[in-house]
């Protein structure tokens, strides 16, 4: 009896086996990888960001028995030294924003509006302070302007100065170091904002007689406000939370320095808890300034 294949085609070949469905690659389906990546990111943030913050706030708002209380903050407000540290931190942050704004705006305008020799090289030089570790900068200042620094040694040798002059030790030194370290944050944001300004707006202002300082004040500066505020907020928060620079320069009455000193002493439980209270207060203030800056930008019209 002939096969069906032989009858139809006469080839005598056996029928080809049916094609099997393509095999799936081993492991998770391709559509599951984005979900897995998002899960890992959230797990990382929860473990290393959310949990530490929650633990700080829990310890700051609780007593030794674990009961929620505001007594720790009452003690903070009743201590004149901590209140002075809070005021000093706010004043230093605002002063640093002011000085970095002047220097950062000037350099940004120079880089964007003027063409000069080695402009690109100069723009790279302005990035060095921000990419170098903060401790390197403050140590460099002490080597140059400290009591035994280069400047004081030259003053003693050349001008017979009896006592070394205090150039950097104190709040003025912290302001100087923070300004020269953080002004690139203003410069970078303002340069980006200046590059996005429509030249037609400034040309229209010039056509009606607005030139020089008047054009800068009424057209250019308002249009750079969103970018400037982003840089100013970074400068303020960085200065507000920096403890290494003040400690090296002998300034202890700042919130960040007190938080560090109280937490690392590991002896007095009350001081340790006060360090956590200061840390929680700094986080709350930083969030408040961030919300205020975002709302200020939101209610302004920059179109």
Regions found by a protein language model. Name each.
Residues 6, 18-22, 199, 214, ...:
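Feature of multi-pass inner-membrane transport and sensor proteins
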Residues 12-18, 61-71, 147-160, 250-258, ...:
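Peri-membrane helix termini and adjoining interfacial loops of integral membrane proteins
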Residues 30-64, 74, 78-195, 223-243, ...:
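Membrane-water interface segments at the C-terminal ends of transmembrane alpha-helices
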Residues 1-41, 293-303:
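Transmembrane alpha-helical segments of polytopic membrane transport and secretion proteins
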Residues 208-210, 222:
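Glycine/proline-centered hinge or cleavage motifs at structural transition points of membrane proteins
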Residues 62, 143, 243-269:
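Glycine-rich helix-loop "coupling/hinge" segments at transmembrane-helix boundaries
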Residues 117, 210-211:
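Short coil/turn motifs that cap or connect alpha-helices
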Residues 66-69, 191-203, 212, 225, ...:
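Transmembrane helix boundary and interhelical loop/hinge segments in multi-pass membrane proteins
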């Amino acid at each position: 009896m002939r096969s069906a294949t032989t009858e139809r085609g006469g080839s005598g070949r056996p029928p080809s086996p049916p094609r099997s469905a393509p095999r799936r690659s081993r492991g998770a389906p391709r559509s599951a990888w984005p979900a897995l990546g998002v899960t890992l990111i959230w797990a990382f943030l929860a473990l290393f960001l959310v949990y530490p913050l929650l633990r700080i706030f829990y310890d700051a708002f609780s007593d030794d028995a674990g009961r929620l209380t505001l007594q720790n903050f009452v003690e903070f407000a009743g201590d004149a030294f901590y209140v002075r540290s809070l005021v000093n931190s706010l004043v230093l942050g605002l002063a640093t924003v002011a000085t970095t704004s002047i220097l950062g705006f000037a350099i940004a305008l120079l880089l964007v509006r003027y063409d000069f020799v080695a402009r690109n090289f100069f723009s790279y030089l302005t990035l060095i302070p921000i990419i170098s570790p903060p401790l390197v900068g403050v140590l460099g200042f002490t080597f140059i302007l400290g009591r035994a620094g280069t400047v004081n040694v030259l003053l003693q040798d050349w001008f017979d100065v009896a006592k070394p002059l205090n150039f950097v030790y104190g709040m003025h030194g912290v302001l100087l170091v923070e300004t020269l370290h953080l002004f690139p944050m203003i410069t970078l944001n303002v340069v980006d904002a200046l590059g996005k300004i429509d030249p037609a707006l400034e040309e229209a202002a010039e056509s009606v007689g607005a030139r020089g300082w008047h054009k800068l004040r009424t057209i250019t500066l308002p249009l750079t406000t969103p970018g400037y505020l982003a840089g100013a907020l970074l400068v303020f928060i960085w200065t507000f939370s920096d403890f290494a620079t003040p400690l090296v320069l002998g300034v202890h009455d700042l919130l960040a320095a007190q938080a560090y000193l109280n937490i690392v002493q590991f002896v007095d439980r009350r001081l340790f808890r006060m360090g956590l209270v200061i840390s929680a207060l700094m986080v709350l203030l930083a969030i408040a300034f961030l919300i205020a800056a975002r709302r200020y930008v939101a209610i302004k019209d920059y179109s």
